[in-house]
């Protein structure tokens, strides 16, 4: 028996092509797409305006299957984190951050991460595999369902109010994994987020965060430009080589040039640089002045992130006064600078704390133990 096709794996064009293979017209694909994403429906029998014969056919050959939630944690500040089973003993984490005027969903793109940034809990777990498009968009599908938002979002779309009154108004690809290392599946999910037959989010409200894979930044600019955030975290190559090892392949000069090129087509007129504040590592006044020189030709804003500790990280958070002074130097240079409010740290849902459950294929744990052995 053939494995059923998971329809969450398709963007609109892909679903139209798949339906064409069944001898069905494009409008049928769009009907099913709306039921899946705008109504949050995973039961073909409930798709009442779809022909009964097609519903019967779909039940035999297709499914609508998001990841399976295995744990639901709610922080004292209202942040909500789901642990989602993606098979073969792997699980990823998705975080919803409610605020007064918006709700942001933080989505994972990989089971683990191979980039091994020094201060990130996900990287310490190693890497297993890329998530499928269904597993990525399924996080938004599932969060809408669990938050009771699917039908509300559909009503907003019908009323022409695309961004008002939604529970999830913003999506950030800032969960587990490096999104641009899983380019094709991430872009399929992004297209669904943007498409009016699915979620209809504004490009300005969808953000991809990258550690700096330069060729993929250029490709994203050409294929699906959304808001871009760059995990910078260092003001010079020597320090960034240590904190963000991908810098050894794509150093800061190349990364800054890629950011300039991206802005030619970006929905926002600036790049967001994320900068984790590590006590005594990258938080000195000299680092701030190096940053000013580094980004002088890149319209940008800085988001300073107080480090969120995790076991055996080896780092400490910069104190509040040091962060305030660091931000002040950037602000005095005319750079918009914010300090991220830590959310969800009591359920390990804060930035840098997501770990999930990863069956490492990189032997990272073995290599780490070997490096710690007394020789």
Curated annotation (Swiss-Prot):
InterPro entries attached to this UniProt entry: Aldolase_TIM (IPR013785), Methyltransferase_A (IPR040072), RlmN_N (IPR048641), RNA_MTrfase_RlmN (IPR027492), rRNA_lsu_MTrfase_RlmN/Cfr (IPR004383), rSAM (IPR007197)
Q: Which cysteines are joined by disulfide bonds?
A: 106-351
Q: Which UniProt keywords apply?
A: 4Fe-4S, Cytoplasm, Disulfide bond, Iron, Iron-sulfur, Metal-binding, Methyltransferase, rRNA processing, S-adenosyl-L-methionine, Transferase, tRNA processing
The record's listing under SUPFAM superfamilies reads: Radical SAM enzymes (SSF102114)
Cofactor dependence: [4Fe-4S] cluster
Which residues make up the binding site for [4Fe-4S] cluster? 113, 117, 120
Q: What's a Pfam family in this record?
A: Radical_SAM
Entry's Gene Ontology BP terms: rRNA base methylation; tRNA methylation
Which Gene Ontology CC terms are recorded?
A: cytoplasm
The catalytic activity, as recorded, is: adenosine(2503) in 23S rRNA + 2 reduced [2Fe-2S]-[ferredoxin] + 2 S-adenosyl-L-methionine = 2-methyladenosine(2503) in 23S rRNA + 5'-deoxyadenosine + L-methionine + 2 oxidized [2Fe-2S]-[ferredoxin] + S-adenosyl-L-homocysteine; adenosine(37) in tRNA + 2 reduced [2Fe-2S]-[ferredoxin] + 2 S-adenosyl-L-methionine = 2-methyladenosine(37) in tRNA + 5'-deoxyadenosine + L-methionine + 2 oxidized [2Fe-2S]-[ferredoxin] + S-adenosyl-L-homocysteine
How is the cofactor bound, in the record's words? Answer: Binds 1 [4Fe-4S] cluster. The cluster is coordinated with 3 cysteines and an exchangeable S-adenosyl-L-methionine.
Which residue numbers delimit the Radical SAM core domain? Answer: 99-346
Entry's localization field: Cytoplasm
Annotated membrane-spanning segments are none
Q: What else is known?
A: Reaction proceeds by a ping-pong mechanism involving intermediate methylation of a conserved cysteine residue.
Q: Which family does it belong to?
A: Belongs to the radical SAM superfamily. RlmN family.
Described purpose of this protein according to its UniProt entry: Specifically methylates position 2 of adenine 2503 in 23S rRNA and position 2 of adenine 37 in tRNAs. m2A2503 modification seems to play a crucial role in the proofreading step occurring at the peptidyl transferase center and thus would serve to optimize ribosomal fidelity.
What name does UniProt use for this protein? Dual-specificity RNA methyltransferase RlmN
The protein's organism comes out as Azoarcus sp. (strain BH72)
